[in-house]
């Protein structure tokens, strides 16, 4: 019985991740390449952002280090990143405090 419950939780977790990564963010065109790449970096750092260990500006620098290129000025990159962080919080039913 416990393995069925664990299987259901894992299935729900995967479904949430699928929903998160398939969500279109206004400003996705500000990034060169696959949206999965930059979204994955944001997703992996979501907890650090939520706990205020990492600022959006630092996250954008991290994205550059990982090879993500931007088609717009760096100051505009904040908007799609913030929107995506807010969407992750919404899917997980968590609240975010403004940074």
What does each model-found stretch correspond to?
Residues 48, 52, 66, 91-95:
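Surface-exposed polar/charged interaction patches
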Residues 59, 74-99:
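Charge-dense, extended regions
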Residues 51-74:
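Short acidic, hydrophobic short linear motifs in intrinsically disordered regions
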Residues 1-32:
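Long, low-complexity, charged/polar intrinsically disordered regions in eukaryotic proteins
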Residues 37-53:
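Positively charged, polyanion-binding regions of nucleic-acid-associated proteins
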Residues 24-25, 42-45, 66-74:
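Short, local alpha-helical segments
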């Amino acid at each position: 019985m416990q393995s069925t419950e664990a299987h259901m939780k894992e299935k729900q977790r995967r479904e949430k991740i699928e929903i998160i990564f398939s969500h279109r963010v206004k400003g996705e065109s500000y990034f060169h390449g696959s949206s999965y790449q930059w979204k994955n970096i944001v997703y992996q750092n979501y907890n650090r952002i939520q706990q205020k260990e990492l600022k959006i500006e630092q996250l954008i620098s991290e994205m550059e280090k990982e090879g993500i290129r931007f088609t717009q000025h760096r100051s505009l990159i904040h908007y799609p990143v913030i929107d995506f962080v807010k969407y992750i919080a919404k899917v997980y039913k968590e609240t975010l405090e403004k940074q």
